[in-house]
Curated annotation (Swiss-Prot):
Record has Lipid biosynthesis as a keyword: no
Gene Ontology terms: cellular component: plasma membrane; proton-transporting ATP synthase complex
Gene from which the chain derives: atpB
UniProt protein name: ATP synthase subunit a
Residues spanning the signal sequence: none
Pfam families listed in its UniProt record: ATP-synt_A
Top-rank taxon: Bacteria
Keyword Signal among record annotations: no
Record's bilayer topology term: Multi-pass membrane protein
Keywords on record: ATP synthesis, Cell inner membrane, Cell membrane, CF(0), Hydrogen ion transport, Ion transport, Membrane, Transmembrane, Transmembrane helix, Transport
Molecular function (Gene Ontology), one example: proton-transporting ATP synthase activity, rotational mechanism
SUPFAM superfamilies, per the entry: F1F0 ATP synthase subunit A
Source organism of the structure: Enterobacter sp. (strain 638)
Xref: Gene3D superfamilies: ATP synthase, F0 complex, subunit A
BP-aspect Gene Ontology terms: proton motive force-driven plasma membrane ATP synthesis
Length: 271
C-alpha cells in the first residue's frame, strides 16, 4: 500500500478509510466517492470485531475443557490470571448481587483488549492482503478505532444501566431519581431532569468516545510514521511507540471494563 505513486496524504487517507457497504444496494462503496448516507456499514470493523469475539470464546472454551486440577500449562495459567484479576475488580467495585456482572466484565476486558491489539500489526500487512488477494478497495483492521464500534458497545452498557436502575428501584423509583435529585422539591423537577438526564446520557457517550479517541490517535501515529518517514528510519520510532502502545491498549481495555462495572454498580444502588 505504500506504493511509490502514493503521496503521503493519499497513503494516510487510504489507511483511514473503511471498507463500507451501502445497505440499500448491498454493494461496496467506492472509497474515492463515499456517499454521505446513514445506510452505510463499515464491514471491516464489523468483521474483525466479530472474529475477535469468536476468538475470545474459542480460547476460553478450549481452556475450560482442558482445565486440570494439576499443574496448569502456561496458557491456562494466563487465562486464570486474567479471570482472577477481573473477578477481583468486580468484587471490589460492584456491591450488588448479580451473576451477570463478572462474565460481562471479563468479556468487555478481553474483547476490547483483542480489538486494541490489532493496532500492533504492521500497518500494511492486512490491507495489502485485502487488496491483492481479495481485491478490496480499502481495509481498516482496528475495530476500536471506529467510533461506530465503540459507541455501539457503550450503548449496550447504557441499556444495562437502564435495566438495572429499573430492576433495583422500580419504574417509580427510577423516575424519582431523575426528577427529585439533586434538589428534592417538585419546583425543581425541570432542573433536576435536565441535570440527571445529561449525567445519564454522558456515561455512554464518554465511555465510547474515550476508547475511540485513544485508539484512533494511536492508529494515526503508526500511519504517520509509516507514511511520512523513509522505510529505513521507521523502525527507530515504530518500535518504541509499539512498546509504549502495549501499555495504552491494555489500559484502555481496563478503563472500559472499570467504568462499565462502576456505572452498573451505581445503577444497582438503592437510594
Amino acid at each position: 500500500m505504500a506504493s511509490e505513486n502514493m503521496t503521503p496524504q493519499d497513503y494516510i487517507g487510504h489507511h483511514l478509510t473503511n471498507l463500507q457497504m451501502d445497505l440499500r444496494t448491498f454493494s461496496l462503496v467506492d472509497p474515492h466517492n463515499p456517499p454521505a448516507t446513514f445506510w452505510t456499514l463499515n464491514i471491516d470493523s464489523m468483521f474483525f470485531s466479530v472474529v475477535l469475539g469468536l476468538l475470545f470464546l474459542a480460547m476460553f472454551r478450549s481452556v475450560a475443557k482442558k482445565a486440570t486440577s494439576g499443574v496448569p500449562g502456561k496458557f491456562q495459567t494466563a487465562i486464570e490470571l486474567v479471570i482472577g484479576f477481573v473477578h477481583g475488580s468486580v468484587k471490589d467495585m460492584y456491591h450488588g448481587k448479580s451473576k451477570l456482572i463478572a462474565p460481562l466484565a471479563l468479556t468487555v476486558f478481553v474483547w476490547v483488549f483483542l480489538m486494541n491489539l490489532m493496532d500492533l500489526l504492521p500497518i500494511d500487512l492486512l490491507p495489502y492482503i485485502g487488496e491483492h488477494v481479495f481485491g478490496l478497495p480499502a481495509l481498516r483492521v482496528v475495530p476500536s478505532a471506529d467510533v461506530n464500534i465503540t459507541l455501539s458497545m457503550a450503548l449496550g452498557v447504557f441499556i444495562l444501566i437502564l435495566f438495572y436502575s429499573i430492576k433495583m428501584k422500580g419504574v417509580s423509583g427510577f423516575v424519582k431519581e431523575l426528577t427529585l435529585q439533586p434538589f428534592n422539591h417538585w419546583a425543581f423537577i425541570p432542573v433536576n431532569l435536565i441535570l440527571e438526564g445529561v449525567s445519564l446520557l454522558s456515561k455512554p457517550v464518554s465511555l465510547g468516545l474515550r476508547l475511540f479517541g485513544n485508539m484512533y490517535a494511536g492508529e494515526l501515529i503508526f500511519i504517520l510514521i509509516a507514511g511520512l518517514l523513509p522505510w529505513w528510519s521507521q523502525w527507530i520510532l515504530n518500535v518504541p511507540w509499539a512498546i509504549f502502545h502495549i501499555l495504552i491498549i491494555t489500559l484502555q481495555a481496563f478503563i472500559f471494563m472499570v467504568l462499565t462495572i462502576v456505572y452498573l454498580s451505581m445503577a444497582s444502588e438503592e437510594h
